[in-house]
From Swiss-Prot:
GO terms for cellular component: actin cytoskeleton; cytosol; mitotic spindle. The gene is Arhgap6. Residues 44-57 have a biased composition (Gly residues). The lineage of its organism: Eukaryota, Metazoa, Chordata, Craniata, Vertebrata. Residues 1-21, 100-115, 658-676 have a biased composition (Polar residues). It comes from Mus musculus (Mouse). This is Rho GTPase-activating protein 6. Residues 403-604 form the Rho-GAP domain. Keywords: Cytoplasm, GTPase activation, Phosphoprotein, SH3-binding.
């Protein structure tokens, strides 16, 4: 038999039928049953034996053992065949690389540039090429350890492809092997590298510094809280000698019920003949929260259906109204609010929330933060990030990959929050609250209403003692106590430690609790602390004596201690035998709960050292996650070393059009829904590199001074990524402003930049050289008469920003042009700037236009020629009162800067001074200062002084005339006389 026929029989999809096929198939089935649960090495050995027997049978080999036939039976013949060598060489010359460690003596070694790379390739699904490509790609899908370079093709094929558990007989096993392979090392993070400095400060390569501070545990993301559990568990084992075994508590829903509990619950259901399934009492805490959320979603859905039914007529008249409403709805960042936070809230019919969008957990998962766009991430969030109870059923290895990067809502049951709110409002002055008896009938009625899932509104007519008894009964009936049975001994043994160590140990034990237990415990301790503060009698503001409730922290701990921390309930006989021991434990429980009530605020704060450990743990596995978390911490901090915030939204409460599908750093609300994508973060990091390299001191722009819209173009993005030292150099070639981006879309030949802003708040031209307090996306509109002598006015905390100005990142831009005003005049508000500028300049890119008000004029460049005279040659124009600059108008007539104050002002831009025109410029600047005092809503004449001289030099240039004409047309387009031309988001 020739080598060609053998290859055909091996790699074809169907083997030729022969008399021995049935016996081979039967034998293979028996072997498959025998070796299904054996070790892979035994399976490979069995397969090799079968391959040897199959080689003796020749062409009658079955499809299951055909690779062993090639490997064992006829390996020498195929190796000696020239045609087979040619075919094998052509196979290995395919562009799809194999594993870097695989090599055979008969084929040249092919190694990837990095030995740690693992390549995953899709298998072609053609009929003729499926098994061929599979056979030659087997080395790339092997999951076994060891060096593959020392293994022959026969052993490789027999261990992976020919055995009964190989990929040909078990595709599911092959997929699992591919699934558990290490992921491709294609994720590189060269754009930002964070490192810890040892004093809880993290620095990036871009120069950004973040100092960790104590934060509430609720402000941490879901992933951080999961890692915090591990860090606290490690510290408890290493540093705290509690004399007991410590385990991280599992979620109550995952714990199996004992047989006795099952029988007891079955008997109770039969005796009571309930017509409904309990929704609150006697259920795991996570399930109670899931039921509350499901009921809230059902209510929201019914409310939306009712609204849709009432608005069918309007929708039929306006077919696009519904689409527009949904679009606006999805573009806003809706904050997640738990049903337990606002139990009595009613959703406004004017602002509906889509149920799947508004009630998911957190933001994006870890495994999709770098390789999904926004549309895919929305789908991922809706599918993977479902209820907290469902997330616990995942494997522990894949747990972190499904956790959110943003803080999740408070997981507090609706019943607990409703009772606490009612008692805080009506029961703080009730003497003996939680001790006075209640009506069992009314308490049972309230319990049934909550168990049915009814949205119970606890009003003033409800008795305070009934509500207090309901709260105690809920905590007592929980199948697992709030402080969990796993940590029962650990909590009690904290009293054996030194007093200064007890609080820190209690803090670590609280970190071990599941998020639902931790949040519910925080809400309960907060309420009990408020009750304890009203225990003593005091005098009100009116001078009347207010009686206290007499419930001190000790009394409250005596009541709630056994409900929060207890062992599994035992029989009466066991209780009588161990009564003395239980009494001692009860005293310890009361002492522990009392300490927690008195120090609840400190217990739920996460110190910087633990945050640092969490970030170090995440840095080893997910550096991109650490980058996102640290940038969010930086944006939320109020330190002046942060350049800008990462999110922009309007002052009026309406979100920007970029907020729906761009990065959000979590500073809109702690329950933000969006997470960044890798491409955006890399651009942001490059922008930070540029900004930090060029300015000596960085400033933070408050969120309330952020522009609504943005401008986007490839040219502006390329400028954003340019290096920082350019900020101190000549900037006529590469201006860092938005007007240059606009002009690049109109005329690519001109390089003269301008400025954009919000509603015309352009106070200076971006053609001026950058100042120490300038930002990369646009200069702050400053009231310079107020900060004339202080170059660090921004840093000192006295914000002199008059109007909103853009400080948002360029990568978070919308596709439309949302600039509301474009002003070609550098609206410098005092004469001091005019005095700093010479009367004539030879730099064509420092041109300042001679326009006192472009909003009213309708002439073209000829009008500019008629106005090209200095101010001192046109004294009659100083009294004009028919023109006003575009808003924002200059300041309220404070004294302008005089020439005596000029040495105090820093050099704000590069100038080419001329000796012959300096004195004239000073005189004109002083005259402009006087006019600014008398007419605060007029433009200063200092612009006309320097700009008119510049006009005389540039009027002969055709390109400059075209540039002025384009500026004039854009200003007319966006003037107040034509408000319809403004973008929708800025009207």
């Amino acid at each position: 038999m020739s080598a060609q026929s053998l290859l055909h029989s091996v790699f074809s999809c169907s083997s030729p039928a022969s008399g021995g096929t049935a016996s081979a198939k039967g034998f293979s089935k028996r072997k498959l049953r025998q070796t299904r649960s054996l070790d892979p090495a035994l399976i490979g050995g069995c397969g090799s034996e079968m391959g040897a027997e199959g080689g003796l049978r020749g062409s009658t080999v079955s499809r299951l053992h055909s690779p062993q036939l090639l490997a064992e039976g006829l390996g020498s013949r195929l190796a000696s065949s020239p045609r087979s060598q040619h075919l094998r060489a052509t196979r290995f010359q395919t562009p799809r690389p194999l594993c870097s460690s695989f090599s055979t003596p008969s084929t040249p070694q092919e190694k990837s540039p990095s030995g740690s790379f693992h390549f995953d390739y899709e298998v072609p699904l053609s009929r003729s090429g499926l098994k061929k490509s599979m056979a030659w790609d087997l080395p790339s899908v092997l999951a076994g350890s060891g060096s593959a370079s020392s293994r022959s093709p026969a052993s490789i094929l027999s261990s992976s492809g020919g055995g009964p558990n190989g990929i040909f007989s078990s595709p599911r096993r092959w997929l699992q092997q591919r699934k558990f392979q290490p992921p491709p090392n294609s994720r590189s993070h060269p754009y930002v590298v964070w490192r810890s400095e040892g004093d809880f400060t993290w620095n990036s390569m871009s120069g950004r510094s973040v100092r960790l501070r104590s934060v509430p545990i609720q402000s941490l993301s879901e992933l951080e809280r999961a890692r915090l559990q591990e860090v606290a568990f490690y510290q408890l084992q290493q540093d705290c000698d509690l004399g007991c075994q410590i385990t991280i508590p599992k979620d109550g829903q995952k714990r199996k019920k004992s047989l006795r509990k099952k029988l007891d619950s079955l008997g109770k259901e039969k005796n009571k003949d309930k017509e409904f399934i309990p929704q609150a009492f006697g259920m795991p805490l996570s399930q109670v929260i899931a039921n509350d959320r499901a009921y809230k979603l059902k209510q929201d859905l019914q409310r939306e259906e009712q609204k849709d039914a009432s608005s069918d007529f309007v929708s039929s008249l306006l077919p696009f109204g519904n689409k527009k409403q949904n679009k606006e709805l999805s573009s806003s960042n809706s904050s997640l609010s738990s049903t337990s936070e606002t139990p009595n809230e009613s959703t406004s019919p004017n602002t509906p929330e889509p149920a799947p969008r508004a009630r998911r957990r957190g933001a994006m998962s870890v495994d999709s933060i770098t390789d999904l766009d926004d549309n895919q991430s929305r789908l991922l969030e809706a599918l993977q990030l479902s209820l907290p109870a469902e997330a616990q059923s995942k494997k522990e290895k894949a747990r972190d990959k499904k956790l959110s990067l943003n803080p999740i809502y408070r997981q507090v049951p609706r019943l607990v929050d409703s009772c606490c709110q009612h008692l805080e409002k009506h029961g703080l002055q009730t003497v003996g609250i939680f001790r006075v008896g209640s009506s069992k009938k009314r308490v049972r009625q309230l319990r049934e209403e909550f168990d049915r899932g009814v949205d119970v509104c606890l009003e003033e007519e409800h008795s305070v003692h009934d509500v207090a008894a309901l709260l105690k009964e809920f905590l007592r009936d929980m199948p697992d106590p709030l402080l969990t049975r796993e940590l029962y001994t650990a909590f009690i043994n904290t009293l054996l430690l030194e007093p200064e160590e007890q609080l820190g140990t209690l803090q670590l034990l609280i970190y071990l609790l599941p998020p639902c237990n931790c949040d519910t415990l925080h809400r309960l301790l907060q309420f009990l602390s408020i009750v304890a503060r009203h225990a003593d009698d005091n005098v009100s503001k009116d001078g009347q004596e207010v009686t206290g409730n007499k419930m001190t922290s000790l009394n409250l701990a005596t009541i709630f201690g056994p409900n929060l921390l207890h062992k599994q309930k035992s029989s009466d006989k066991e209780y009588s035998v161990q009564s003395s021991a239980r009494a001692e434990e009860s005293t310890a429980i009361i002492a522990v709960v009392q300490k927690m009530i008195e120090n609840y605020e400190a217990l739920f704060m996460v110190p910087p050292d633990l945050q640092n450990e969490v970030l170090i743990s995440l840095l080893e596995t997910d550096p991109d996650v650490v980058d996102y978390l640290l940038r969010r911490k930086a944006s939320q901090s109020s330190s002046p070393d942060i350049l800008q915030t990462e999110v922009s939204f309007s002052m009026g409460g309406r979100h920007s059009s970029t907020d729906s599908n761009k990065a959000s750093s979590g500073d809109i609300s702690p329950y933000d829904n969006n997470s960044p994508v890798l491409s955006e973060r890399s651009l942001l990091a490059m922008q930070e590199d540029r900004a930090r390299g060029g300015s000596e001191k960085l400033y933070k722009v408050p969120e309330q001074y952020t522009l609504v819209g943005h401008l986007s173009s490839p040219k502006s993005k390329s400028r954003e990524s340019s290096p920082g030292p350019r900020l101190g150099k000549e900037m006529s070639e590469e201006p860092f402003n938005i007007w240059g981006t606009w002009h690049s879309t109109l005329k690519s030949g001109s390089k003269d930049p301008g400025m954009t802003g919000s509603y015309g708040d352009i106070f200076e031209s971006s053609s001026l050289r950058p100042r120490p307090c300038s930002l990369s996306q646009g200069n702050l509109s400053l009231n310079w008469p107020r900060c004339q002598g202080s170059p660090t006015g921004l840093d000192s905390g006295t914000q002199v920003i008059r109007r909103t100005q853009t400080a948002a990142t360029v990568e978070q831009c919308s596709v439309h042009l949302p600039v509301s005003r474009v002003c070609s005049t550098p609206h410098i508000q005092d004469g001091s700037r005019g005095t700093r500028r010479p009367a004539a300049s030879s730099d064509p890119f420092l041109s300042l236009n001679s326009t006192e008000d472009l909003a009213e004029g309708k002439e073209d460049v000829a009008w500019l020629q008629s106005q090209a005279r200095p101010v001192y040659q046109r004294p009659q124009e100083s009294g004009k009162d028919d023109r006003r600059p575009p808003p924002p108008y200059p300041g309220s007539g404070k004294p302008a800067t005089t020439s005596a104050q000029l040495p105090l002002e820093p050099p704000l831009w590069r100038l080419q001074r001329h000796e012959e025109g300096s004195e004239t410029a000073v005189e004109g600047g002083q005259q402009a200062s006087g006019e600014h005092q008398t007419r605060p809503k007029k433009l200063s004449s200092a612009y006309s002084l320097s700009a008119s001289e510049q006009d005389k030099q540039n009027l002969g240039e055709a390109s400059w005339l075209d540039w002025q004409r384009e500026r004039w047309q854009i200003w007319e387009l966006l003037s107040t006389d034509n408000p319809d031309a403004l973008p929708e988001t800025l009207v």
